[in-house]
Amino acid sequence: MGQNPKRLLKRAEFLAVRRGEKRRGRFFLVEVLDRGDGGVPRVGYTVTKKVGNAVVRNRVRRRLKEAVRVHAADDMVPGNDYVIVGRDDALRAPFGQLKAELSRRFRGTR
């Protein structure tokens, strides 16, 4: 099992990842930036106001965080930063499907 990713916390870190590759999924968008240092992967979560009120956005964020923690962190590439932009469908998706989709996007496969 790989080590758990660290969190992206600062606005500048989130903006830097926007320059990287974008991998679109049905339930979310994953933005990926290779830092080039081979260190522990870092991940940040964003859910826009288009998704719903604060309660709904936090539920989407919590589901994505748990999917990464339980399963998808093993598929993250060391030295990469990831920003996961949650979509409305992430709230209604079966958890197994959400985990599988995250793993595919982290590996860069369709």
Swiss-Prot record:
Entry-linked InterPro entries: Ribosomal_Su5_D2-typ_SF, Ribsml_uS5_D2-typ_fold_subgr, RNase_P, RNase_P_CS
EC top class named in words: hydrolase
Keywords: Endonuclease, Hydrolase, Nuclease, RNA-binding, tRNA processing
GO biological process: tRNA 5'-leader removal
Any one Gene Ontology cellular component term annotated for this protein: ribonuclease P complex
Cited function: RNaseP catalyzes the removal of the 5'-leader sequence from pre-tRNA to produce the mature 5'-terminus. It can also cleave other RNA substrates such as 4.5S RNA. The protein component plays an auxiliary but essential role in vivo by binding to the 5'-leader sequence and broadening the substrate specificity of the ribozyme.
Source organism superkingdom: Bacteria
EC number(s) on file: 3.1.26.5
Reaction it catalyzes: Endonucleolytic cleavage of RNA, removing 5'-extranucleotides from tRNA precursor
Subunit structure comment from the entry: Consists of a catalytic RNA component (M1 or rnpB) and a protein subunit.
Family stated for the protein in its record: Belongs to the RnpA family.
Protein name: Ribonuclease P protein component
Molecular function per GO: 3'-tRNA processing endoribonuclease activity; ribonuclease P activity; tRNA binding
